[in-house]
Structures are given as C-alpha cells and as structure tokens.
C-alpha cells in the first residue's frame, strides 16, 4: 500500500488544519482554563492537545492566533503566568465546550457567561470546572 503524502508548505492554514484534524481520530478534546492579570477566567476547547510523557509528566496543547495574528486569550494568559488547568470532558459537557469556543473580547469570561461551576485548584490559580471528570493542574 502506498503512503499518502502531504506537503504542509503547499497547504497552509485552514487546509492544513482540516487535514491534520482528520488524521488522528477519535481524538480527545480538552477544555482549558486560564486566568489573566485582572483575574478574568478564560475557558477554551482544544482538539490539538495530548499528554506526551511521564518523566516529567508533560501535557501539550496548541493554541492558535486570532485572525489579526494576536494570541488568543489562552496563549496570552499562559505566556503571562504559565498556569492552566486542562480538563478532559465527557459528552454531557459538549454544549459548554461549543459555547466556550465562541470568540469573545479579551476580558470577557466564558466561565461567567456560561455559568460554569468552579472550585479552586490546589496548585495553580486557574480554577477547576466542577462538571469535568478529569482536571490536570499544569505549570
């Protein structure tokens, strides 16, 4: 069987995203909470994420930029303070994950807007989403 070859340089941006998103299926989707300097909680879904190792434990996610090239809130908050909580979600959380994917202005909290229940994390500032079955506190 011949391998399918894909030249990423010839298919940038949205074309590459569509192909890459379809290569690894099914793939987990994380809902990531971060917090900005003013204490506003951001929540955003990520399909480009996974755990990559155990020594040390390593989780990786790939936030994209806004259309104007500026970092989205998750990336900006991670660059500013280096902390997040990566939540693994189950099917009952699907509607909330879609709602959190909407583009909101910086400083507007998806957690507040969607009335997501939280409780404090033990090791990082961003909170844990109560309804998610798994929460990884990350630095």
Where are the predicted features?
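Active-site-proximal mixed secondary-structure blocks
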Residues: 1-42, 50-139
